[in-house]
Every structure is written in C-alpha cells, then in structure tokens.
Amino acid sequence: MRHKSFKTNACPVARSLDTIGEWWSLLVVRDALGGIRRFSDFQKSLGLAKNVLSTRLKKLVECGIMEQVSASDGSAYREYALTQKGRELFPVIVALRQWGESHLFSRGEKRLQVLDKRTGKPFRVEVQNAKGEVLTADDLELVTVKN
C-alpha cells in the first residue's frame, strides 16, 4: 500500500518518517550504529530477503543517511557506512529503545540493554532546554517558522 508523501509537510516529524519511517530502515540504522557495515551482515542480523534489504539500503544512501564505501579490510567488497546525517539518528534510536524497554517487556523478561562503556551503567535520553532543565510535552509550544 502506497502512502501519501510528506516531503513538503511543515511538520519535521512527518518529513522524518517519510525518509526513515519504514521500520526496516531504522533497524538497518540501529545495526549500523552497532558496527555492522556489510550487506551479508545486515542480512544475517535482520533476517531480511535480499531484495528488501537492497531497497532499504538504496533509499538510505539516496537520502544521505548511509553511503557506500570501500571495504575496511581492503577487499573488493563495498560496505555501508553511516554519514553524519545517519549518525545523528543515534538519539532517536536510543529514545525508541528506551521507550520499548519501559513499555514492551514484561517483568523478568530478557531484553538487550545498552550501557555506557565508561561507567558500565544504563543511561537515559531526556529533552532539555538551554538551561539544562528537563522538558515534557506540556512544556512545549508549537509555532511555524521559516527555515
């Protein structure tokens, strides 16, 4: 089923979902943030059909989230690396993970957890204002501005 394009929508969330909202795309970005770079490794991790993975990677490259690069081991293979634009999705992936940890697992159920390498402890993503104060949705106002 085709969906309406949000490429000209004034809402940044709608435009973002138009680019990365297909769920395989975010899982590819998640794996790339975890160090996966080769097509076969993405396929193994995600269990995706080659054509679906190929389509997702192509779209991520076209929109500048990933790029094809020479293999890091010097072989003839091509790898996929996150661009700066792609690396900036890190807090989005962490926030989705955090929400899932809080709401989608039963007590005592096993799950993967991401820890801060320096401290070995879990961490939280929070929205803060310029003073470092934590904000909630009730603290926000939506206005239209020109870019």
List where the protein language model places each region.
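A detector for short, charged/polar N-terminal pre-domain segments
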Residues: M1-T8
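N-terminal helix-turn-helix DNA-binding core of bacterial DNA-binding proteins
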Residues: C11-V52
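Alpha-helical linker/hinge and terminal dimerization helices associated
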Residues: S16, L26, C63, I93-H103
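Basic, amphipathic "hinge/linker" alpha-helix immediately C-terminal to the N-terminal HTH DNA-binding motif
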Residues: G21, S72-I93
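Structured loop/turn residues at secondary-structure junctions
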Residues: G34, Q84-K85, K117
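Canonical helix-turn-helix DNA-binding module
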Residues: F39, Q43-A71, S75
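C-terminal regulatory/oligomerization modules of transcriptional regulators
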Residues: V94, Q98-N147
